[in-house]
UniProtKB/Swiss-Prot annotation:
This is tRNA(Ile)-lysidine synthase. It comes from the Bacteria. Its EC number is 6.3.4.19. The N-terminal region contains the highly conserved SGGXDS motif, predicted to be a P-loop motif involved in ATP binding. The lineage of its organism: Bacteria, Bacillati, Mycoplasmatota, Mycoplasmoidales, Mycoplasmoidaceae. The gene is tilS. ATP binds at S10, G11, G12, P13, D14, S15. It comes from Malacoplasma penetrans (strain HF-2). Belongs to the tRNA(Ile)-lysidine synthase family. InterPro entries: Rossmann-like_a/b/a_fold (IPR014729), TilS/TtcA_N (IPR011063), tRNA_Ile_lys_synt (IPR012094), tRNA_Ile_lys_synt_N (IPR012795). The keyword Flavoprotein does not apply. Keywords: ATP-binding, Cytoplasm, Ligase, Nucleotide-binding, tRNA processing. GO terms for molecular function: ATP binding; tRNA(Ile)-lysidine synthase activity. Pfam families: ATP_bind_3.
Amino acid sequence: MKHKYLIAVSGGPDSMALLNKKRHLVEAVCHVNYHDREDSDNDEKIVRDYCKKYNLKLFVFDTHKDDVSKYKDINNLQTWYREIRYDFFEKISQELGIKKILIAHQKNDFLESAYMSLNKNKKNLFLGIRRKSKFRSLILIRPLLNKTKKSLEQYCRSKNIEFVIDYTNFWDRYSRNVVRKMMAEWDKKTFQKFYLKVKWFNLKNMFFIKLLDSKFNNWIKQDFDINYFLKIKNNYKESLIYLFLNHIGIKPNENKIEQIIEFINKNKNGSVKKYRLKENQFIEIKNKKILYSIC
């Protein structure tokens, strides 16, 4: 189905603006009701009303009605949200045969992510959020990365599009919210200066990133053959494992990346020993291939 997308819509100004801008390209709308706020049903109503008005197909995952038992061992709330959300998106993607999904991350989200990465002193090749990326079997597309949150709210008001403001975005219990509140106090000059710093950083690394993406795509085509990986120069290996983890839907961190490289080096002769990624998810090496499994 050419030029048709899924779209993730929360009911907030960012996703409602994106939906209104791209609805002619949308095959189906995906909404998750986490029931994490007293008024979360209002978010769903806003999305339902819009979809009804424009005759758009809507799929809703409701954590009070749908089965969430498989997530009971997840202790981190943000991880719980993410696993539910992307499992749901994948399910709808497979049902409709559409891999591309529009996500409403915007310029503020981009800079918040960049700031948090810099503060963690991580070995960064790219700061912020990519316009296009792969996650599990999905292709995520983010058309709003050059739009500020304020401009999207103004757009919704100018078009009389109803939206909801999630007050939990201002709670200090999440590190991103602390960064968000700090950046909200920046003047335009400070905001733009940091934005240009991030863009310049990414531009300097663009050649390496493109080369890395090419190598990773070749590795996918070879079904994650370990001989291909072992022949790669060491300065690419950490980044390839980062992309591998992201590809299978596991949040990467430096310790996990180092441990997986060590696991591959120790088991390159085809040991059936497994490496535990998290809970019931593992990788193992069989027939010189890295296999991912859920037990």
